Structures are given as C-alpha cells and as structure tokens.
Amino acid sequence: MTPSNMDDNTSGFMKFINPQCQEEDCCIRNSLFQEDSKCIKQQPDLLSEQTAPFPILEDQCPALNLDRSNNDLLLQNNISFPKGSDLQAIQLTPISGDYSTYVMADNNNNDNDSYSNTNYFSKNNGISPSSRSPSVAHNENVPDDSKAKKKAQNRAAQKAFRERKEARMKELQDKLLESERNRQSLLKEIEELRKANTEINAENRLLLRSGNENFSKDIEDDTNYKYSFPTKDEFFTSMVLESKLNHKGKYSLKDNEIMKRNTQYTDEAGRHVLTVPATWEYLYKLSEERDFDVTYVMSKLQGQECCHTHGPAYPRSLIDFLVEEATLNE
C-alpha cells in the first residue's frame, strides 16, 4: 500500500522496521506526541515501501491489550502484519497523543523481549521500577552511600593531615626563632667578652709600664734614701731600756725621772757629757746637717753610759766619732 492510497479517515500510520535496514533504526520520539498531519510533514521520509498505512477511524481506534500471562502487547482488530522474520519493532502513533509504545520482537520471541516491553510500558504508565523491585534500588543506593562515606573519610583524613602539618610547621618555626635569638645573644656575649679582653690586655700593658717605672723610681729612691730619725720618746725608751738590761734593772722610778732631764755637764775628767735627752737633741741637730744612720749610732752608744747623779750620759766626743763612722759606712 502506498501513501497515495491513504484514506481521508486515516488518522495514524504504522511503521515496520526491517532489521536489515540499519538506517531507519533511529526514530525521532518528539513526533510521537504530535498530531498526524505534523508528524507526516516532519517525517516524510518515513513513508516508504516499508510503511503500511492502515485505516483508523475516530470511533474505531485499535485497542491495546496487555495480556498478563505473557506480558505480550496485542492489537485487537483485523490488521495484517508482515512476516515475523521481517518484523522487528512496531511504532504506533494514535490521535490522542497520550503515549507511544514500542513492542520489541525478534525471531525467537523469547521472554526477555516480553520483559523489556512490559518494563517500558509500565514506565510510560507511571509505574516506577523501584515499586516493583525495591531490592534493585537499594543495591543502586549502596555504592552511592559507600562513595559518599569514602569521600567524607578522605576529607577528614586530609583535614587531619593539614592540621598536623600546620602544627609541625609552627613548632619548627618557633624552634627556628628561638635558635636565632640564642645565636644573637651568643654573638652579643662574644663581642662583650672580646671588648673586655682588649681592655684587660691594655690595662696589663699599662701596669707593666708603670711597674717598670716604679721599679726604677724605687732604685732611685734607694740611692737617695734618707734615714728616718726616731722621736724623743722612742730614743729615750730604747736607750733607757737597754741601760736597764745592762745594769740588771737597778734603776728605780726616781731614777727614771732623773734620766728624763735634759742636761749637759762636764765630768771629773773634763769631758763634756750629754744625758739621754740631750743626746737625742744633739743627734737631731746633726741629722739636719748631714745624713747618717741614727740606728747605728744608737746601737754603738748602748753600753757606753757614764753613771753620774744625772743618770746615764754619753761623752760628746764619743757621739761625734760614731756619727762620723755612720756617715762613712753609708
């Protein structure tokens, strides 16, 4: 039957796809829910020798019946189909445009094709696969949950790793800053010690120089040494104590008072005699004129006393001789 033989009452067409023709395997599904005139205009190439129109009146639309026994889609009307070997798929475009059904068939007409047709039909009628097989949906959600759980675990592990890394970096930075501060303090201390060492060395050099100068001055002072003259009391105590030792302490307190008298007199022999205080005064006058060892003179005078009524006394001639001797010895 050709497209020119189509009746005016024809409101639909049926397409038989030859499995050997691979060019017409693709079917534009947007035209299934449009009117017949638009569908024919948009798909003129579909009307070929393999397309067989059939009359569908307004009140005589072929009824679709789903047999529950084998889930096969049947058309209830006397409509001739091509042979089973040439039939692969049937596309029905009704006037109502509510839905379209694909009936998959092959040469063996096995149960797998029936199951796929039933699944597609139930999908178009609003029957969700999850209502028929909830276990399948549950199994589909399990991988998603495991993936989400793994992602969460990975994020937590990465966060913990970043936190540990930041803590370690902060610890190392603190140690670096502390070591730098210690290094600066050590450098400062070394510089202070270097300055102190320089000052000590300079001071040592100055002390050595001053020590040499003082040593030379001491030598000069020794050459220019001037004997210290004892005081009157020191001279008297020394001479009287020595006289007491020589005379075994036979002098009394009254004799001590007599010995302290500063007197000069002439003895029986006509010698000029000086008591202890007078001797000290005479030696003191001589020390102003010349430098001599007074200690030497005092040591030589001891034991040379002349005992008279005025206490121990020393001849002036003896004193002069000892002074000359002390001057020569110097």
Swiss-Prot record:
| Annotated segments matching region Leucine-zipper | 172-207
Task: Tell me the keywords, alphabetical order.
Answer: Activator, Cytoplasm, DNA-binding, Nucleus, Phosphoprotein, Transcription, Transcription regulation
Cross-referenced InterPro entries: AP-1-like, bZIP, bZIP_sf
Q: Which Pfam families match?
A: bZIP_1
Residue numbers bearing the Phosphoserine modification: S135
> What Gene Ontology terms for biological process does this UniProt record contain?
regulation of transcription by RNA polymerase II
Q: Where found? A: Cytoplasm; Nucleus
Write out the similarity annotation. Answer: Belongs to the bZIP family. YAP subfamily.
How is this protein named in the record?
Answer: AP-1-like transcription factor YAP3
